[in-house]
Amino acid sequence: MSTTPGQPWATTGTAAPGVHITAASFSYHHADRERPAFKGVNLDIAAGEKVLLAGASGAGKSTLLHAIAGVLQDDDAGSFGDLRLDGVPPEQARGRAGLMQQDPESQVVLSRIGDDVAFACENLAVPRAEIPDRCRQALQAVGLGHLPLDHSTAALSGGQKQRLALAGILAMQPGLLLLDEPTANLDPEGTDHVRDSVVTAAQATGATLIVVEHRLGTWLNQVDTLIVLEPGGGIRHRLPASALHHDEALRAELVDAGLWVPDHDVVEALPTWLSPGQLPDDSADQALLTGTELAVSRQSSARSWRKTPPPQPVLSGVDITLDSGVATGITGRNGAGKSTLLLTLGGLLAPHGGVITASARLKGEHGARLPSSPHHWRSADLTSRIGTVFQEPEHQFVRHTVTQELRLSAEQAKVPGTKESLFTDQEVTERVAALLDRLRLTHLAEANPFTLSGGEKRRLSVGTALAAGPEVLMLDEPTFGQDAHTFGELIGLLREHLDSGGTVVAVTHDRDFLRGLDADVFALTAAEAEEPPNADTSTAGATATPLLSAVRDTSWLGRRGPLAKLIALSFITIALISTIDPVSAAVVAVACFALLPVANIRLGTFLRRIWIFAAAAVMAVWGAAVAAEESGRVLLDLGLTTISTGSLEMGLSLGARAFAIVLPSVLIFSTTDPTDLADALAQQLKLPTRFVLGALAAMRLLGLMAAHWTTLGHARRARGLGTRFLSQAFGLLVQAIRIATRLAVTMESRGFGAGERTWSRSACFTRADGVVVLGGLAIAASATATAIFAGTWNLVWM
């Protein structure tokens, strides 16, 4: 089944009727803010009505959307008034509304795209036979139909994850679609495709649709109603969407309010400006940074000791020159490797191939000894020369208030090549105040950066880069979430940066941004982009935890059922923990290494996964040998304690047993997909569904944290903080809490915990699974029998 814009959306089963939304004097106030997110909102949205929700950046649009979805999480906040979905509070309408949030990463629940799309259908007890068609149709509608259902979600770019989140909501066929800037990270073609698919689905199912979007022209002709929020207040306007085309007074009012009104050219309305690249000035067109025959990848190519094939580059054959006074826009399809190229040029990722050369001007008067490639510079040398803004701003936040974030950047800035501060204390204060004003963040100066809206976070992240005064700015989607006024302020600041001789490099799909800076367009071509596309987000492609990530395992052991492997593992573990002797442990260890071909795991790969456990086993041997009771000949007298032949034998037995218990676990979990394991535990062992799926989401979160650790290291290097372990560890903890909170919102909005559920894939026990169980039993019996025959078997409870 395929769905393309313009074709009928084929509803599967019985679609939920549209939801009727009412609100009476509804207000919401965040705990740490002086003014409410919104106040006195009165709504009456008919079932099946399609609404475009607009307003200035920070007007409370996302908060209102979360309130309607029933997933507001701030326990210390206050909500007043009445809000109803079909006459009941939103919290009691679980599964009736599908919510798409701004952050793509926190909307991915499971490790394979097919399972992730099916998650909501399962929670809503959609019959198993209907789920595959719903999933394929939804993936086709959002432009991911070419990917296999077992494709890893970790290998998706930010834009692709946004499409995946939308597919999961469309597959629900809910009565209410709540979409928060659903096309913000998409390329222009993807924007039109996704918009048309959403509208087609809403029309076919009769669902109510509310879309938050700054660029009104994207959705205006596809919706019935336009609602404009007043920042900190209620509804400023509610009117038919078509009225905006012919009501000139209304258009002028909304332009003054900072909205992106169709046919109003925001760039044309900006002050006249001639880019330095067009001026006959010696300071212009001087190369600051040059890339030659670049190949880029998230994974390092310098791993010659590995037996596995080296990672393939995301891009190759890239030649790029960044000139003084010139802006460059890196464009291309989602997943093409734009962000990877940006981070490589910024010195945060090592080039996979080719050469990056910094000019003498960029190095500075005192930087003659710096290596040519920024990747080899110290963090302090980097931050005053190259400022980088990540696709996810939160990765770079390290302080408790907005003001402190900006001050940190200005205080970390040094005269290039020296330890001398670039700005005096007075200059730092003035610089911070000016940026707060220009970025329209003055009223949020003491707010926690993590509590800002998406657009406010984006402006702050750009401000932290500007505050350090670097010559080169690397920006990833800098205009996300901006209204027309804040867009203009960003353009103004970046124009001033170009006028001063700096350069701007931006990954962007925003054509207005490119026009506003008169940017050279560096379009990634099919010849440069490798297939299949690798991850393009700040977390994707980083080192992941091998036992917690999605497994596309075609080995004999990988194709066996998780329950059978758990039973086999239980037999082996019981045999090992029942005795303390080295012989049974040695038998199990030999068996595990012998089974590597069955699991299609290379010896080097296996050794890398178990070395930490081997080191722990050696420490256990020493600790037990020192602590055990003396018996036999004394081998080493340490004064306070001794090591004898008996205590050493005990230590060896305990260490070998501990190590042997780990080996089959690594073998089993390296060939077992977490989702398959959850299916088996819930369907075959009948464990509680909430426990199993909660644990599964936690496992994915742990895998994400391994990738986020790498990303946070890059972000702190960009901020001039180097690799401070405790600071980075605290940042990781903050990220874990925030992602877990958003992941919980995603799961709730997709019907998790709504009641009885179905499973898209059945878990069953096969004859081959029986072979696995018998194999585990045979290893356990062989280990025990060999130890008894050798006379070392020592039953622990005797």
Give names to the regions the model predicted.
Residues 177-181, 473-477:
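Catalytic Walker B motif of ABC-type/P-loop ATPase nucleotide-binding domains
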Residues 130-147, 423-444:
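Conserved ABC ATPase "signature" region
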Residues 69, 346:
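Helix-to-loop junction immediately C-terminal to a conserved catalytic motif
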Residues 169-170, 465-466:
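ABC ATPase C-loop
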Residues 152-156, 160, 448-452, 456:
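Conserved ABC ATPase signature
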